């Protein structure tokens, strides 16, 4: 019989093995990485670096809402380099592949939802305070080459991805090689795709949608402050018209 509780506990054996495999003893005993549930590690050949001083639980793997993906397992093939900041959450059903010469950077307060895929052949950076929804794919490579039959030109199959600070990537989106986004970008799901540099071409705090994604709305930002969300929810329980705020946008939106 399926044991729900077993999926919700820290996997002590995998947590110990992971930390003592990738960190020096002085850091491993702090257990900077905590692993829940079943988590397959395909390769221990790579290395992990931290953006801040290693401390307890700075990266949490396989943590999730059991309603969404209770039976999904995560997979890590780490041949290259994984760089993590503080308070990074990677939810259940994650598939991460980091090639030998590649780097994946997850900055402070990055949250990656259930059943996502990240394949890194070159370099992928996800900026601080960025949230990623479920079932989204990041690939910085086309994996194969194509030739222009008239010019004979063959372009590289790999190109880095750089997701800006405080982005919100919706569920069921695709982030392809060469994608670069400004601060505060929202990529609406499902089925939006980005594969180019938007920095300097669109303002910060834009909502993108489509395949390929284009600007749909400007001057829009996700509200991450829990108290603010409660205030807005209470407003809509009693009103049909939009909520109007005239104070400081930063304090209104930032997590508390």
Please tell me what each predicted stretch does.
Residues 117, 173-174:
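Conserved interaction-surface patches within small, structured recognition/assembly domains
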Residues 1-139, 160-166, 183, 196, ...:
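Domain-scale signature associated with acetyltransferase and cell-envelope carbohydrate enzymes
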Residues 153-161:
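A short acidic, glycine-rich active-site loop
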Residues 170-171, 183-184, 189:
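Conserved beta-strand->loop/alpha-helix structural units within folded catalytic cores of enzymes
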Residues 192-194:
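Short hydrophobic beta-strand element within catalytic cores of glycosyltransferases
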Residues 169, 175-178:
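Extended serine/threonine-enriched, polar tracts that run as long, contiguous segments within proteins
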Residues 143-149:
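Short helix-loop boundary/capping segments
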